């Protein structure tokens, strides 16, 4: 019975998100333009000396297309404005009256919102990217096990991204303003997860440090698994890190929320 409540929250938020088709179309056009700019830049750099780079050109192109197709799933800046408004306005009191776990409800809503955004954008981007000329197109994974590993890391990455988002909501309950947290944490997360530059292009020492952070457990792993940059024992280690950080983020976020709810004061009248 308890699970049905969260399924209802998930379905409701998903249906709501699927209604924003015009915004999705506008976003798709922007993502195509950005993808082509990045891929053209890769071609220009790789033309001089392909062996000087840590990833093959095709792997970098695949990384770019997968990143853009699933951007809304992993982007750290995809936040739920309704939840932030609940915290700052005091309407969180209504949510606290419901016979549900607040953390689980917010987690369900946030995950559903990400999935609905991706559902509108991913397929068109993937289809068009696969039909482009060689060197600019998205190619399939090297084999079936790699594809299934990609799906597994995608699920774990999405769960980690949502847990990180929940951490921002919970910390906002302590500060009453998300502006500072968003400016610091979201910029840091976007850089350290490989959202600006893929982690293989980082200096070796910095890359190894970044790969151990919770940020790398989001989009970095599935993108690099798909492009063939992570395989074998490295892939197993990466999946283990994803599971580890998921537990840390969820348990830590839930504990922080419990502590925050003990001190909640609803102001206004």
Annotate each PLM feature.
Residues 1-269:
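Hydrophobic transmembrane alpha-helices and immediately adjacent juxtamembrane helices
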């Amino acid at each position: 019975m308890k699970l049905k409540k969260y399924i209802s929250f998930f379905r409701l938020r998903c249906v709501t998100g699927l209604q924003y088709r015009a915004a999705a179309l506008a976003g798709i056009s922007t993502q195509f333009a950005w993808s082509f700019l990045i891929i053209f830049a890769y071609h220009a750099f790789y033309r001089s000396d392909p062996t000087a780079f840590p990833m093959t050109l095709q792997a970098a192109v695949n990384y770019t297309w997968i990143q853009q197709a699933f951007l809304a799933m992993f982007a750290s800046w995809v936040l739920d404005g309704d939840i932030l408004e609940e915290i700052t306005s005091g309407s969180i009191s209504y949510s606290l009256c419901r016979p549900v776990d607040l953390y689980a409800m917010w987690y369900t809503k946030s995950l559903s919102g990400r999935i609905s955004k991706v559902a509108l954008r991913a397929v068109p981007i993937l289809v068009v990217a696969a039909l482009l000329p060689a060197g600019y197109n998205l190619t399939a994974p090297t084999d079936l096990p790699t594809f299934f590993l990609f799906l597994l890391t995608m699920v774990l990455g999405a769960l980690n991204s949502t847990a990180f988002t929940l951490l921002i909501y919970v910390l906002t309950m302590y500060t009453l303003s998300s502006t500072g947290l968003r400016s610091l944490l979201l910029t840091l997360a976007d850089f350290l997860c490989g959202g600006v530059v893929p982690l293989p292009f980082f200096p070796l020492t910095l890359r190894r440090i970044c790969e151990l952070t919770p940020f790398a457990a989001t989009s970095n792993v599935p993108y690099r698994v798909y492009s063939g940059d992570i395989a074998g024992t490295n892939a197993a280690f990466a999946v283990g890190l994803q599971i580890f950080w998921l537990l840390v983020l969820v348990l830590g976020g839930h504990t922080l929320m419990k502590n925050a709810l003990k001190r909640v004061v609803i102001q206004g009248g």
